[in-house]
Regions:
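Motif-centric detector for short Cys/His coordination patterns
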Residues: 1-110
Length: 110
């Protein structure tokens, strides 16, 4: 049997990976974002009160965009993703959480 699993839901069994289970079972969602190009910072504010921090330069489409374009984002997937229509860029809560966990586990400083 050929599985169609790709870094997320295993569509052959409709099962979620650990991060997706956490996001959906706990109801974790992106509430808003705060962008600071001068500090190379993207803050992801969660409905839980938590804040995730990413380097804007980690995302070339965002890093090279104007502040005007950066402000024109939409939360998608009921707060599980962010879309910038003008930039054709999509980022996910799952990706942010995965990167945060990886960086904390391996002691990387952002």
């Amino acid at each position: 049997m050929n599985s169609s699993k790709t870094d997320g839901m295993d569509t052959s069994t409709n099962s979620y990976d650990t991060l997706e289970q956490l996001i959906y079972q706990e109801g974790i969602r992106i509430k808003e974002i705060d962008i600071h190009p001068d500090m190379d910072m993207l803050l992801i504010i969660l409905n839980t009160g938590g804040v995730l921090q990413e380097k804007l330069s980690a995302y070339p489409q965002l890093h090279n965009a104007s502040m005007e374009s950066l402000k024109k984002y939409k939360l998608i997937g009921k707060g599980t993703g962010i879309h910038w229509p003008e930039l054709d860029e999509d980022l996910s809560l799952k990706g942010f959480l995965r990167d945060t966990i990886r960086n904390q586990a391996f002691g990387k400083v952002k």
